[in-house]
């Protein structure tokens, strides 16, 4: 499928490795992955939703099986570049009444796409979101600017080493070490040059002001113990999106779609209106 846009004529399906699964004619859910991952990290939730929903999965450019030739470091130094890609998918496949589920940094991409074109979206689910990782005044994102600079310096100087050390911290499921191994493998499959740009975009973005632009029913899903998105961040997001709901999973880590797929899928399905 080809479409016009700021990137010129592009094959949207190939660019983002778009895949459609689940029940034709069911409510449509788009599952968007976060930094260093690809759509495969949704597989456990996908299996639990596929009998009731039509599912749209994809890889961000620079990740998974996306088209390497589509990579543009200037475009993707802003979350808006990723958000524009998502809107391109939505328009190319003429998706309407869409339930968008964004994990981690993709949650803020969801905020941007819904703010840009709310007519296409019925609901928004933000899974372990953070609008800003860096502390600012009374806002507590969980990290100082120095923390983030050190994290990015480590990533840029030794990406593979960073991946092996950070994956267990991000996954936060010490009783399931195989999940940290999987996340490490996912990080290591990502081109380091792309990962460096995506990491800076992820950890240096500040989307707090964009939360007020969301005008569709929104569910915020947080974990009880999450190093990257602590409880006060989930509360902040819920308080700054008018009418939104907050669900706290009795789970540890930043990736409950892997570590707690049952309750994650249940929360998404209940909000999305499975019958």
Annotate each predicted stretch with a short phrase:
Residues 244-275:
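Catalytic active-site module of serine/aspartate enzymes centered on a nucleophile-bearing elbow/loop
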């Amino acid at each position: 499928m080809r479409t016009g846009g700021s990137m010129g004529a592009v094959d949207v399906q190939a660019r983002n490795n778009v895949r459609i699964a689940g029940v034709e004619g069911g409510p449509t859910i788009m599952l968007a992955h976060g930094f260093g991952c690809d759509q495969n990290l949704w597989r456990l939730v996908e299996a639990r939703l596929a009998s009731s929903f039509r599912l749209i999965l994809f890889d961000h450019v620079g990740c998974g099986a996306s088209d390497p030739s589509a990579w543009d470091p200037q475009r993707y130094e802003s979350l808006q570049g990723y958000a524009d890609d998502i809107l391109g998918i939505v328009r190319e496949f003429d998706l309407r009444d869409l339930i968008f589920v964004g994990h981690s940094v993709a949650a803020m991409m969801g905020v941007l796409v819904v703010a840009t074109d709310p007519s296409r979206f019925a609901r928004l689910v933000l899974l372990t979101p953070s609008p800003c990782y860096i502390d600012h005044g009374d806002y507590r994102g969980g990290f100082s600017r120095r923390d983030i600079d050190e994290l990015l310096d480590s990533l840029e100087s030794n990406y593979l080493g960073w991946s092996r050390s950070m994956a267990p911290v991000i996954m936060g499921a010490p009783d399931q070490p195989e999940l940290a191994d999987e996340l490490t493998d996912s990080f290591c499959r990502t081109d380091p040059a792309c990962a460096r740009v995506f990491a800076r975009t992820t950890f240096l973005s500040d989307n707090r002001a964009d939360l007020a632009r969301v005008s569709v029913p929104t569910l915020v899903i947080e974990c009880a113990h999450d190093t990257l998105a602590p409880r006060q961040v989930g509360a902040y997001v819920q308080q700054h999106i008018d009418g939104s709901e907050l669900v706290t999973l009795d789970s540890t880590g930043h990736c409950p779609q892997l570590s707690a797929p049952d309750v994650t899928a249940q929360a998404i399905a209940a909000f999305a209106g499975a019958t």
